[in-house]
Amino acid sequence: MSVSGDDFDDYFDDEIDDVIVPGTSDTVESVQTNNRPAKQSDISISQGNEEDEFQSPDRLSGNAVQFEDVERTSKYNVFIPKCKNVQENIFVTQLTQPPSPPEMIRGPRWKKPGPEPLAPEPATTRVGANHQSDQYHDEDKEMEAAIAASLRSFEEENGGDVPSTASGSTPARTAAAPCAAPKGTAADVPFDLDDIPDDAFDSDLSLSPPRSTSQATRGPPVQSQFRTNRPLGLRQSTLFDMAARNPDISSQRGEQIFSPPEKSEPPTHHKLNEEALNTWVYPTNLGKTRDYQFNIAQRGLFHNLLVALPTGLGKTFIAATIMLNWYRWTKSAQIIFVAPTKPLVAQQISACFQVAGIPRSETTMLTGEAAPGIRAEEWKSKRVFFMTPQTLVNDLKSGIADPKRIVLLVVDEAHRATGGYAYVEVVKFLKRYNKSFRVLALTATPGSTVESVQAIIDDLGIAKVEIRTEQSLDIREYVHARDTEVQTFQNSDEMVLCMELFTRTLQPLVDQLRNLNAYWGRDPMALTAFGLTKARQQWMGSDAGRNANLALKGKVNAIFTVLASLAHAIDLLKYHGITPFYRHLLHFQSNTDGQKGGKYQRQIVQDESFKKLMNHLQPWTKNPDFIGHPKLEYLKQVVLNHFMDRGEGTAANGDQSQSATRIMIFVHFRDSAEEVVRVLKRHEPLIRPHVFVGQSSAKGSEGMDQKTQLSIVQKFKKGTYNTIVATSIGEEGLDIGEVDLIVCYDSSASPIRMLQRMGRTGRKRAGNIVLLLMQGKEEESYIKAKDNYEKMQQMIASGTRFTFHDDKSPRILPPGVRPVAEKRQIDIPVENTQADLPEPRRRARPPKRPPKKFHMPDDVETGFAKASSLTGKVTKKAETKRAVRKPTPEPVEVPALEEVLLTPRQQQDLERRYCHIAGTSPEFIRNPRVDAYPRLQSVPRPTKAVKHGSLTSRMIGTLQKMGKVSVDCESRYRKVLALDSSKEIVDSVLSRDPWPPAKNSGRLGEKTHAFKRPSATPRPNNVHVREDENEDNCTPELVSPEKLMSSFLEPHTERPPYSSQRSQDAFELDFPDVETLLNRSAERHVSRKRNRFVLDDDSDE
């Protein structure tokens, strides 16, 4: 075979995957020995005997490639590699793409055939092949088998018919380059290279995961766990208009049958309705059954599922179906539907009431507006809850909601479930107390990066993903057409003038940062807040910033702060209009009034260019007909044309509620929203716009609470407003089927926000989308967001980049239960037709907040644990002796006196039997004597059961003291009693105490008398007043000073020890005997013992 110079050029222009370029060391040597490299030579591959046009590279390796000189010069230069490389055949089981240097040309890679041998091919006669060895024939067959296996695998992945290899007639294989075959060659290769698609040997695993080769060679494949009526011969294309070689099973058309996973797990704690477990209900109230909704709902019953569907394809219907079946399967378990805002919650309630048929009496809607006491009552009596995630977190933490009763959690707008959002906190809290609950996550845009999607899967415990794109086969017929119009604009003359003046104002500050190497940009109009923040951080972290003095650091920080505050004004001017730009500059200028503001802020305000700019802006903004941005003018024309084309305002009655079309306009800032509303209100009543913003209040703009937001949405649905100008609050979840036009006033670099905006239209009928973009950065952001969305959808559909958590998805249903689908009409209760929301009624006096309740997780260790027990070492406890149990004394009532006294008959019996002793000598029985046996009486005698009483103890003590008295005590006491009669006056004075005790006023050292008591006569310690004077005369008797002084001046006689002040010479005291003393002591305790129970009988009385 010979190839001319032109054919050689075309040969290298083709893709390397389409042809096989044989190369050997001999070829390289022949090229290097060519004396005329500028001339292109013809290629002649000559072999001893003519055989196939293309043979195995190994067969060609032994033949030299001869170059014949030609006089014609080629326009291409032949690349001569410096290193010799032998391009060998590589046979692999999977078409992976290993890393290899681009300068090295490798040989072809072939996929090996299956383990089972292929059908024997018919023998063919090769002309002139007798001189070749059998080794070449074996390698040729191996290559042919590899090509056959590759083509068969490709056809299977695309659902096409696999060509039979056992047939005797096979198409002839021809060369890639058109050339005539020499005479005498036999073209008996069983495949044609033209029949092999361009991407047959593509190694992209995300698009074509490897399949078992056994299925490709064994005939009919084994029936899997689902059956499908997918039509053959269809070829699905991807978002990039490429052939999808392995369409995901979930996107196949037709109904599939799934079963609960077989898992070994403990039985659920929920009470199940065994009669309803055999079937699961699919509502047919909405008409035709959609296969993708049937398949997704079935899988969501048995797995923790993430559903990613384009907007308007019935995610709420899927959620309502799953909620209905878990409501049937359980008796008292609770089902929760959470959505970010109250308008979304209210929207889902109305949809579930009309689809699932769950009784209204079992349903409630809870938000932060309801009192905690009312919410506690709702948690006790209801089973289905629609609420915001923040309210659910508060109820779970306070113990109002029981986490163990929850069996299903439906999460709407699940792309928010990242970081510390309330969705994540709810799932974490439930996992601590409940191991048996299902999670269903709904979203239209799962995420913009692989990390964000994986975070959603991890935080929610997702086990399966069901994703569809607008090009999926099973949803294509239900997707309404949406025409997207992208309109780009250039800056107007007024905007250019403002940019020039503002550039002159900011240029000095930018130059100062450039001179300090703190910022490298030259154009002030390219300033962004994020870029300035990063530049400040880099300069502070550099050597220049760390070594700078405080004055220089303060200067750089001040300049960065001023420029960052004005960077937002630059964005307003570029993308939103002159009026928002002017409002921002007015606020910046007001901060410098008086002594307010810093040095560089006042420098900008006092600049001549800034003053010129403000002089231009002031008359423009005061003109009501002024439109400060080319986007606004185009927007006005688009809205007017839309309403006029739909016949808006032409009704005879002029009823505004008859409006059949709606428009939603999305902006990024509230200033832009107010400016758009101001421009559109000029054309009322044809255009009836209203702004729709979030709850937080900003400077110059008040927020909307959830009640106001819900009211605006209802009026928008009824037709009171036919145009809504919304910020990001309106991007998610609003289902208004009459929205036929979406206008994106500015672009968003986030693919999630962009797709959410576009999803507000095309729900009930075809819709239109108009994107208003400025040339440059905004247009690039839109293209980037679109490409990012398409790439992420492809990654999620392949499922090769994510890790799913099947272990966190419980079965819940008992083992062996396989519910069968039951399609039927659901009877909607009459109570569900009420228009108002199922909110709890407000009360004049709401119930009190219940006390906080702490729920206990399952299998938790209660009580306190010792540190020694945590180490795993078991220590033996010291054996304690068992204490002897003492009998508990019982109270005994004291009987009456009449009951214990002897009767006359008993008295006679006592005297006759015990008091009278017969005999000659008289015997007398007397009371116990205390003077008998003095030594035994003064010592307590041993006791066993009954102890000595208090009276006995006191008696023993008295006798012991009496025993210690000496023999001469009588003479000593007589001296004490024989006192002088002159001492009587002193004794009486001292006993009456003419100096009364001072009242304690609470302060130390306070004096209450004018004079002190004489120190010569100290006051005795034990002074008692006579009894006859103490009772009648409370006031002491006054004594004359002469009599008192005479008593002190008399000679002092030494008093004997133990003298008593009451002793007198005239009489001698008669001390009572011991029996009298004992009787008096007992009488003082009588009154105390009368009303007291006797606990133990231990008295000797």
Swiss-Prot record:
SMART domains given in the database record: DEXDc, HELICc
One Pfam family per UniProt: ResIII
Binding site for ATP: 309-316
Any Gene Ontology CC annotation: nucleus
Location relative to the cell: Nucleus
Protein origin, superkingdom: Eukaryota
Bias (Acidic residues) ranges: 191-202
One Gene Ontology term from the biological process aspect of the record: double-strand break repair via synthesis-dependent strand annealing
Domain Helicase ATP-binding: start-end pairs: 296-464
CDD domains with a match to the protein in the record: DEXDc_FANCM, FANCM_ID, SF2_C_FANCM_Hef
Record's compositionally biased regions (Basic residues): 842-854
Entry keyword Ubl conjugation: no
Protein function: ATP-dependent DNA helicase involved in DNA damage repair by homologous recombination and in genome maintenance. Capable of unwinding D-loops. Plays a role in limiting crossover recombinants during mitotic DNA double-strand break (DSB) repair. Component of a FANCM-MHF complex which promotes gene conversion at blocked replication forks, probably by reversal of the stalled fork.
Family per record: Belongs to the DEAD box helicase family. DEAH subfamily. FANCM sub-subfamily.
Subunit structure: Interacts with the MHF histone-fold complex to form the FANCM-MHF complex.
Protein known as: ATP-dependent DNA helicase mph1
Provenance organism: Aspergillus fumigatus (strain CBS 144.89 / FGSC A1163 / CEA10) (Neosartorya fumigata)
Lineage: Eukaryota, Fungi, Dikarya, Ascomycota, Pezizomycotina
